[in-house]
Amino acid sequence: MIKVTHKEHHERIGSKEDVIILSGPPSSLNGLVTFHNESDEKILVRDLMVHTHKNQDVVLPVGVILQPREVKAHLITYSMDPHTPPGRYEMTVQLGKTRKKVLMVVHESMHIQLSPRKMVLNGIEGGQVHEKEVLFSNMGNIDLFVPSIRHGTIQDRDITCRNLGLALRTDAEEGVEKTLDVFTRGIKKDLSDFVKISIKEAGEVVKPGQAILLHIAMTVPKVLKKNYNYEGEFSFYYKAIRYQLIDKTPVENPQRQKSK
């Protein structure tokens, strides 16, 4: 089997396409190419050399086996710099005796990283402000604004189990409707207000490949119950930052009190 690479034997293959088109986000450009083995021997097309208008050579991976004189459609995938701006990029490739046009159609790619994505808020005093820092990285190929976020959710992690248990024990014999009524009233009673969110850098532009340290102020609701397990989250583009509230109030141990 003859190996066709960007260095040798590329004259043995051809392509039916007048223009080879690869399309997608910069990290994953895909396109279907119909290769023709113009020789009487089995060949492996490993890769091809693509020539850019900036006089740069780019190796295009292929990886297809062709039997003698076989014609086969093959999906090609190519990765560019992840920060390559959206647009159309024209190149050429030598296939046999013909130089073919290669069109790379780069689409918008939103890719972000947040660190950390889980926080601990130490203290549930009413109206307490927690200040946190989060690193926001733009890993895509378009400009992104730091979003203006107003609030995040907060809820007691045991709200469903506790109120369902109370409803079943208290009014289970009075029928399903009565039980559900007690359950929903308990849920409503235990619901908390939102956590207020403020990001100092809101509105700033983060270029592709850049990162910015965000200063986030989080104000807990004025009314929270002691010794409850509160948790919540807020959305940041397509990701979520989660947080857990820790009550710093010491819990009295009944057994210890008895021993005294």
Give, region by region, the residue ranges found by the protein language model.
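Surface-exposed loops/turns
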Residues: 25, 68, 85-86, 126, ...
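Buried hydrophobic-core signal for structured, non-transmembrane domains
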Residues: 31-36, 76, 89-95, 131-137, ...
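Extracellular/luminal low-complexity segments enriched in Ser/Thr/Pro
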Residues: 76-85, 188-190, 216-226
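Beta-sheet-dominated interaction scaffolds and their linkers
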Residues: 1-40, 109-143, 149, 256
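Beta-strand elements of well-folded, non-transmembrane domains
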Residues: 37-39, 52, 80-82, 95-97, ...
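Terminal connector regions
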Residues: 83-109, 222-257
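Extended, hydrophobic interaction surfaces within ordered domains
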Residues: 63-96
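Surface-exposed binding patches on compact interaction domains or structured appendages
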Residues: 2-17, 36-76, 141-212, 216
